Curated annotation (Swiss-Prot):
Keyword Acetylation (UniProt): no
Keywords of this entry: Cell inner membrane, Cell membrane, Cytochrome c-type biogenesis, Disulfide bond, Membrane, Redox-active center, Transmembrane, Transmembrane helix
Protein name: Thiol:disulfide interchange protein DsbE
Transmembrane segments: 5-25
Topological domain ranges for the Cytoplasmic compartment: 1-4
Compartment(s) of residence: Cell inner membrane
GO BP field: cytochrome complex assembly
Amino acid sequence: MNKKILFIPLVLFLLLAAALLWQFNRNADGDDPTLLESALVGKPVPVFKLESLQNPGQLYSQKALINGKPLLLNVWATWCPTCRAEHEYLNTLAEKGVRVVGLNYKDNRVKAINWLNTLGNPYALSLYDGDGMLGLDLGVYGAPETFLIDGKGIIRYRHAGDLNAEVWKDEVQPLWNKYSKLAED
């Protein structure tokens, strides 16, 4: 009887070790929440009414995003170190004619304006989402996140994390080219 009681902690330990090992393997092979496709891909941009970042009181709705041509909606904040890392590349894309709309997310308006004045402003339009409601409606995990929106206001792609030259070339640019061509037809 005593021998059986001694084996109970060993069995419990082995079960716990097996569960931990399973969880580590599960996370290592692709259960990364940033890789989840947005539930909004293929659907219109959520209805919103937000102020301009630089001009409080000047309101914009989702209709401001629709002009027949695709755009990138970039969710960013000054408290986000990865946003700083991607900012220079966003400036480069804007210089190449890519329409980028900024969504300043849960941030301090004054700090955000100073950031753009210091680092450059790649945004054709800057929206202020101080309470994060549009971010919530978009299913944003955090900043940065970038959405490709076609000329009709339909979300076609979501990227969580740094939008850099490699991500642009491999993932976003082919879709950008596709929806730009459709806008021309």
